[in-house]
């Protein structure tokens, strides 16, 4: 029998770029918090087993109530993302060897992206990230002056879930320094290889008000289609 993977969802961030109000993961999207959409999407994935959510310390009980239907563990997150990932990792059952870390703000990530990351882990990769080609021209700038144009053919935008062997993720967080924005960066700092799989446009991160509008528009299209096919949303 193929072992299930565990998923950590750091969801304690304030999300200041979305404006004042609730923590980002608890912001409303089409009548439900981003976090509910994200966890529902994870629960639609055949390979996903235990899910641990790191919530704002003041909202742990409220988040447990929100997610009652989805069989998740909710723990108090920390001031920084790394603190929340560590707290969630500590609550994951000891027998889980393959771990995904997923942003609650990437709440419309398709099932296929999750399964591609899992397949790469099961095929022997120690660390995996879903990526997309960079569409825009990218320039390096210093003091408001262009230094050079970067070859975008060598660049990729990185999404989540990011997948890891548990021992490697624990080692990376044990040696973590500040200034890195994702878990794969911590692994890279150890000198360990990180492989890529195809991401998806739908797995964008809800960071600004315009992203919320885009997510609402996408849900308005995908939810009726899923209903006509007799099931839940394909990407939630």
For the regions a protein language model found, what residue spans apply to each?
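Conserved core of the sugar-phosphate nucleotidyltransferase
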Residues: 109-197, 233-236
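Short phosphate-binding loop-to-helix
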Residues: 67-99
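Residue-level signal for inorganic ion chemistry
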Residues: 9, 35, 88, 102-103, ...
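SAM-dependent methyltransferases
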Residues: 1-7, 12, 182-184, 201, ...
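Short, high-confidence coil segments that cap the C-terminus of an alpha-helix
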Residues: 48, 96, 124-127, 192, ...
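N-terminal glycine-rich phosphate-binding loop and ensuing alpha1 helix
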Residues: 1-60
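Short active-site oxyanion
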Residues: 47-52, 126, 201-203
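Glycine-rich phosphate-binding loop signature in dinucleotide/nucleotide-binding domains
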Residues: 2-3, 92-97, 122-124
């Amino acid at each position: 029998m193929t072992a299930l993977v565990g998923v950590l969802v750091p969801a304690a961030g304030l999300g200041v770029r979305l404006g004042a109000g609730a923590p980002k993961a608890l912001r409303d999207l089409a009548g439900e918090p981003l976090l509910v959409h994200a966890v529902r999407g994870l629960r639609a994935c055949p390979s996903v087993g235990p899910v641990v959510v790191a919530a704002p310390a003041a909202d742990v009980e409220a988040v447990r109530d929100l997610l009652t239907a989805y069989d998740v563990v909710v723990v108090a997150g920390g001031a920084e993302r790394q603190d929340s990932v560590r707290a969630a990792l500590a609550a994951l059952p000891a027998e889980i060897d393959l771990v995904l870390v997923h942003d609650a703000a990437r709440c419309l990530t398709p099932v296929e992206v999750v399964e591609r990351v899992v397949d790469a882990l099961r095929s022997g990769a120690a660390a995996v990230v879903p990526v997309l080609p960079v569409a825009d021209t990218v320039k390096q700038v210093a003091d408001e002056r262009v230094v050079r144009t970067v070859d975008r053919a060598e660049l990729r935008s990185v999404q989540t879930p990011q997948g890891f062997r548990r021992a490697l993720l624990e080692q990376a967080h044990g040696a973590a320094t500040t200034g890195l924005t994702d878990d794969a960066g911590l692994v890279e700092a150890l000198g360990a290889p990180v492989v890529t799989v195809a991401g998806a446009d739908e797995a964008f991160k809800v960071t600004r008000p315009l992203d919320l509008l885009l997510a609402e528009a996408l849900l308005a299209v995908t939810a009726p289609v899923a209903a006509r096919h007799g099931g839940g949303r394909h990407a939630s």
